[in-house]
Amino acid sequence: MSEEQQVQPQLALERIYTKDISFEVPGAQVFTKQWQPELNINLSSAAEKIDPTHFEVSLKVVVQANNDNETAFIVDVTQSGIFLIDNIEEDRLPYILGAYCPNILFPFLREAVNDLVTKGSFPQLLLTPINFDAEFEANMQRAQAAAVEGQA
């Protein structure tokens, strides 16, 4: 066999961990009021190359719950994973880092947020599942449209 035939693509989750976590309840008066929260949820992802075959991919969510115009709680969680990515076509890397890996991390992030909120004595907060594949595709289309617009 030639060397080319022996080289197999590798994609594996080697480690998953909570990189950063915070839960704040600014004031106890929130527990004396009827619970009708307004939620502000911000989610972002990032990827960093650690070495030639490893990437750290992180999902970060910040949830602020306001009740009766007061901050009830703020949750800030960054869930990360170390992924082995080797012998993968370069043009597939953005999809893997921007959609495939976040799809793996999201259930862990969702569980961490819910655990913090319920341990903080609030009703459970289950983040709505996200289709990172669709988000990635939409971002690619926006980038292509912006590039075409910039050339016009």
Curated annotation (Swiss-Prot):
Gene Ontology, cellular component aspect: cytoplasm
Keywords, alphabetical: Chaperone, Cytoplasm, Protein transport, Translocation, Transport
Major localisation: cytoplasm
Pfam hit, one: SecB
Record-linked InterPro entries: SecB, SecB-like_sf
Lineage: superkingdom: Bacteria
GO molecular function: unfolded protein binding
GO biological process: protein folding; protein tetramerization; protein transport
UniProt keyword Lyase, yes or no: no
Subcellular location: Cytoplasm
Family: Belongs to the SecB family.
Subunit structure: Homotetramer, a dimer of dimers. One homotetramer interacts with 1 SecA dimer.
Role played: One of the proteins required for the normal export of preproteins out of the cell cytoplasm. It is a molecular chaperone that binds to a subset of precursor proteins, maintaining them in a translocation-competent state. It also specifically binds to its receptor SecA.
NCBIfam families in UniProt: PRK05751.1-4 (NF004393), secB (TIGR00809)
Protein name: Protein-export protein SecB
